[in-house]
């Protein structure tokens, strides 16, 4: 997820309150998207009042375009309505329109939309992996993955990423497309999402080899996207999981960016909706407290370990990290067949999402409480984990 070192000055950057809504500060290192915003409504706003607010925004935006000769803007684009209560929208507005919105008493805060990206940092083709064996063993250096034959059967993993090659032989027909918030191509043109999905539910590379995988595409071929688009994917996954049984669902987000209150609130809404969510800590070797959605306390934040049970040199750290998982030189599926090796907290996170699915298959309780279960099962082995950071490494409880 790394910060992109480009600070963009903006008249609205400083946090302020104008007759109601707070315009959140844009932190240094955030790659904001020009004239694009995320607006979050007050807690508890009714559907009727939310509809009324959106109608007001659309009317005023049209008037600005037609009557005032305002610079052409796209207006409202995405609407968010999580089943757990979080409501908001994103869009393309000029500064005057945003100032009008900020004066509304029904708006909680406004945030600049910003760029997010995947957390893989390197690749190497066709070398053996070690992560699975480590998850199933109390000692390092093993070559066998010990696991219960239930293998996550009956669970569903939502992979919020670049998409998944659902035809890959690793998934044996258990992978499906859920939603696409990027383009009209239901394919993984990057490879990151397929790799992540394989670590969760692949027949060879997966922690939960019988789990179902649902692709939720929020990142493009370069592995990049926006907070507003990612939040759309988070909302869709929450609603779909609740329809099918949230207690049987896990979600994986091997992505992120600089701190975003909207991104954190959306992650919290997933957890509140009863879905276990694993999120990458990030790859900048800094405290993950300044990263989102990794800094949201109600989810499970994952740092990356090496084959030698040490912190990977790229991995973020800090009190927000819940547990370590293998993330250095991990082999998994690639689009079109075969495998590739990637490193990053992106690769660590699906080991934990997969472990959550595996535990659901064993009959353990689902939901955000799975993070506590995983931490209780973890082993205290990570060397030099980083300041104020746990030294716990995940374990499935099956090995020697």
UniProtKB/Swiss-Prot annotation:
The active site is at 161 (charge relay system), 192 (charge relay system), 346 (charge relay system). The keyword Iron-sulfur does not apply. This is Subtilisin-like protease 7. Gene3D superfamilies: Peptidase S8 propeptide/proteinase inhibitor I9, Peptidase S8/S53 domain. Belongs to the peptidase S8 family. It comes from the Eukaryota. Residues 21-119 form a propeptide. Its EC number is 3.4.21.-. One of its GO terms (biological process) is proteolysis. InterPro entries: PCSK9_ProteinaseK-like, Peptidase_S8/S53_dom, Peptidase_S8/S53_dom_sf, Peptidase_S8_His-AS, Peptidase_S8_Ser-AS, Peptidase_S8_subtilisin-like, Peptidase_S8_subtilisin-rel, S8pro/Inhibitor_I9. Residues 1-20 form the signal peptide. Keywords: Glycoprotein, Hydrolase, Protease, Secreted, Serine protease, Signal, Virulence, Zymogen. One of its GO terms (molecular function) is serine-type endopeptidase activity. It is found in: Secreted. Pfam families: Inhibitor_I9 (PF05922), Peptidase_S8 (PF00082). Glycans are attached at residues 252, 396. PROSITE patterns: SUBTILASE, SUBTILASE_HIS, SUBTILASE_SER. It comes from Trichophyton violaceum. Residues 129-400 form the Peptidase S8 domain. Secreted subtilisin-like serine protease with keratinolytic activity that contributes to pathogenicity. CDD domains: Peptidases_S8_PCSK9_ProteinaseK_like (cd04077).
């Amino acid at each position: 997820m790394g910060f992109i070192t480009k600070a963009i000055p903006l008249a609205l950057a400083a946090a302020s309150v104008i007759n109601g809504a707070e315009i959140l500060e844009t932190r240094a290192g955030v790659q904001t998207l020009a004239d694009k915003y995320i607006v979050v409504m007050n807690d508890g706003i009714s559907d009727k009042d939310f509809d009324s607010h959106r109608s007001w925004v659309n009317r005023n935006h049209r008037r600005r375009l037609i009557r005032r000769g305002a610079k052409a803007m796209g207006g409202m684009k995405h609407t968010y309505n999580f089943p757990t209560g979080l409501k908001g929208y994103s869009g393309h507005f000029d500064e005057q329109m945003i100032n009008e919105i900020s004066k509304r008493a029904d708006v909680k805060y406004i945030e600049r939309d910003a760029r997010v990206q995947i957390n893989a940092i390197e690749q190497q083709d066709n070398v053996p992996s070690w992560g699975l064996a480590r998850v199933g063993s109390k000692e390092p250096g093993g070559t066998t993955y010990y696991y219960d034959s239930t293998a996550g059967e009956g669970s569903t993993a939502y992979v919020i990423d670049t998409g998944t090659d659902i035809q890959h032989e690793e998934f044996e027909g258990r992978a499906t497309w859920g939603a696409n918030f990027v383009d009209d191509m239901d394919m993984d043109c990057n490879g990151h999402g397929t790799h992540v999905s394989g670590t969760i539910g692949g027949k060879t590379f997966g922690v939960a080899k019988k789990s179902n995988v649902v692709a939720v595409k929020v990142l493009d071929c370069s592995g990049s996207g926006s907070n507003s688009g990612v939040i759309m994917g988070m909302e869709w996954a929450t609603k779909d999981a609740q329809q099918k049984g949230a207690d049987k669902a896990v979600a994986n987000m091997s992505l992120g960016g600089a701190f975003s209150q909207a991104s954190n609130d959306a992650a919290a809404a997933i957890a509140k909706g009863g879905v276990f969510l694993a999120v990458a800590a990030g790859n900048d070797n800094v405290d993950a407290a300044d990263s989102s959605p990794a800094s949201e306390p109600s989810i499970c934040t994952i740092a990356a370990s090496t084959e030698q049970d040490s912190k990977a040199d790229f991995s973020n750290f800090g009190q927000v990290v819940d547990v370590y998982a293998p993330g250095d030189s991990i082999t998994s599926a690639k689009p079109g067949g075969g495998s590739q090796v990637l490193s990053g907290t992106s690769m660590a996170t699906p080991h934990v999402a997969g472990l959550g699915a595996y535990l659901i298959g064993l009959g353990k309780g689902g939901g955000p409480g799975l993070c506590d279960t995983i931490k209780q099962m973890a082993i205290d082995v990570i060397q030099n984990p980083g300041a104020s950071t746990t030294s716990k490494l995940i374990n499935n409880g099956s090995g020697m």
